[in-house]
Design a protein with these regions (language model features):
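Metal-cofactor-binding active-site regions of metalloenzymes
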Residues: 25-558
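Bacterial N-terminal signal peptides that target proteins for export
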Residues: 1-9
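Bacterial N-terminal signal peptides
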Residues: 8-19
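Membrane-interface motif at the C-terminal end of an N-terminal transmembrane signal
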Residues: 19-25
Length: 558
């Protein structure tokens, strides 16, 4: 049967890649519908045209991004030159001065470069990122990705505010409004305490097969041991590092605000991007050190959450007023396939189970399921995500790539949907590290099972991408519609760790707003007094209202 004539006319008048003008017959439709037609027309015009459309599409939040991995290689090289650091041409890494041969002063890689200096500069950018990487026998994308951090790392915090500014500026340019940055605060004191006072449950005494679900690690008796160990660490002064950890964030935020001229008439657009922090715990250390660092993380986050004074570690860059704690949650990081990470996985989830009972208000997001067949034995693919949800109390899962290898995967998907456990989807990272892409990725399976998902970049500097790139990739690879993209953006803020109630009456159901804000245009400039009072009392709802305002502004263009 031939399509109706008006559809043929609309097709003939379809949007051009240059202007994205909506067909005349669609201009009387609702703004959402007009934007959807423009989106489809841009898709038909090809990836470059769709990139233009998606660049200014409101994206809400970026929830899975490591600060060190978010910075582009060029920034690290420039800062190394400013700091008088050296370059090791053989290792393609930065080094401390003096720059005696074979080391080369990083300053030689700025200004007018000789051909040799340009070649070294290019090799450094490649070594600090996935640019141009081609896997070879014995050196995979996984190896390249994680080796980059050793090459540009260990440089102190002098430029931390510049790194946050780089992330916020990029976010503002592509219409993001909120970012949760993962960062590892200092924990040398906690690590030393753990080394001098090892945890009684030493998993190194167990056999190497201890990553299986029936592992003897972390049995019920460990809970009492954790309680005793927690108190011992407190008695030995574990809390002494908390002020320094919070000051690190405060100083970075202050430097960022200065760079962006926030609060002045010259304020940069990045000032409007809210930034919060997730406390990274390194999972590749012995049990006592992991527990001590996690314990310090929970204490630091709780202290930040409890802080109500103007010297709180969190300043929203736009006006400098204290809004909410700098640290809003905790995450476990480092390669999940590492020996200790695999051996101690259940034990570490038991640690989180105990610490959650002591600090129930601290938010938890966990890297889990960043694994693929062949990377570890099959037994290692069968329980990480489930244990992160059920033992680790994860509200969000980072990656979740091996979910269909989990024992009773359909049941796990149902459980995640029922509990509204969101999955942070990192498409480019998963391809680069695990070689998983397209139909092999579980992204569409999560969506089909009604598990909430949102897009994120993981390490946009290392991967040489941005969040728009991930939206473009998802749109093309999985044939997403315009309203699918809106749901992804809304889901990101719905599952952010911002304080307060959601704008929406039911979790992950973006149809009916909370009672206080019903019967009025969402995202309007003048919410009712009752709605305004509700928004003023909830950071999350206020951010969600702003997202709806941005949708209205974006869709009004079509």
């Amino acid at each position: 049967m031939r399509p109706p004539a008006f559809l043929l006319v609309c097709a003939a008048l379809a949007v051009t890649a240059a202007s994205f003008q909506v067909p005349v017959c669609a201009q009387t439709a609702l703004p959402d519908a007009r934007a959807a037609r423009a989106y489809q027309a841009a898709r038909q015009a090809g990836a470059p045209a769709l990139r233009v459309f998606l660049d200014q599409f409101p994206k809400g939040a970026e929830l899975h991004i490591h600060l060190s991995g978010a910075v582009y290689a060029e920034s690290f090289i420039r800062e190394a030159s400013e700091d008088g650091l050296c370059v090791n041409p053989a290792a393609l890494s930065l080094a401390q001065p003096p720059c005696a041969a074979p080391l080369v002063p990083a300053a030689q890689l700025s200004g007018s470069l000789t051909p040799a200096a340009q070649r070294l500069y290019d090799r450094l950018v490649d070594a600090f990122s996935m640019r141009g990487f081609v896997a070879t026998s014995g050196f995979s994308g996984h190896d390249q990705f994680f080796s980059t951090f050793d090459r540009f790392g260990g440089r102190g915090q002098r430029h931390a505010g510049e790194w946050v500014d780089e992330v916020a500026s990029r976010a503002a340019a592509e219409n993001e409004q909120y970012v949760e940055l993962m960062e590892t605060p200092a924990f040398a004191h906690a690590a030393r305490l753990a080394q001098e006072n090892p945890l009684g449950l030493d998993s190194s005494r167990q056999q190497d097969s201890s990553w299986q679900q029936d592992s003897p690690l972390g049995q019920d008796s460990s809970r009492e041991e954790f309680a005793r160990y927690r108190q011992r660490l407190l008695d030995l002064g574990l809390r002494e590092e908390i002020p320094a950890d919070r000051e690190k964030v405060r100083a970075a935020e202050a430097q960022r605000r200065q760079i962006e001229h926030c609060g002045s008439s010259q304020a940069a657009p990045a000032c409007q991007v809210q930034v919060r922090y997730l406390y990274q715990v390194l999972r590749g250390f012995p049990p006592g050190q992991v527990f001590a660092q996690a314990r310090l993380g929970f204490e630091t986050i709780q202290a930040s959450m409890d802080a109500a004074s103007p010297d709180s570690t969190s300043l929203d860059a736009a006006d400098g007023k204290a809004r909410a704690p700098g640290f809003v949650g905790l995450n476990f990081v480092q390669p999940e396939d590492g020996f200790i990470a695999m051996r101690d996985y259940t034990l570490q989830m038991k640690m989180l189970d105990y610490l959650h009972s002591v600090y129930p208000k601290v938010h938890i997001s966990l890297h889990a399921g960043e694994l693929a067949s062949g990377l570890v034995p099959p037994e290692g693919l069968r329980f990480h995500i489930r244990q992160a949800v059920e033992l680790g109390h994860a509200e969000r899962i980072g990656h979740g790539v091996d979910v269909m290898n989990e024992q009773d995967a359909p049941g796990l998907l149902r459980e995640m949907a029922q509990r509204h456990v969101m999955v942070e989807i990192n498409l480019s990272s998963n391809e680069g590290i695990l070689g998983v892409k397209g139909a092999e990725h579980p992204f569409p399976l999560y969506r089909a099972a009604h598990v909430p998902v949102a897009l994120s970049t993981d390490d946009e500097g290392v991967s040489r991408i941005d969040l728009t790139h991930e939206y473009l990739r998802a749109a093309l690879d999985y044939r997403l519609g315009y309203r699918d993209l809106k749901q992804l953006a809304r889901t990101s803020l719905e599952h952010s760790f911002l304080a307060g109630a959601s704008l929406w009456a039911a979790t992950d159901s973006f149809t009916t707003p909370a009672a206080a804000c019903q019967a009025q245009p969402l995202g309007g400039d003048k919410p009712s007094p009752r709605c305004k009072s509700f928004l003023d009392g909830s950071e999350k709802a206020a951010a969600q209202w702003e997202l709806e305002r941005r949708f209205r502004a974006f869709e009004a263009k079509f």
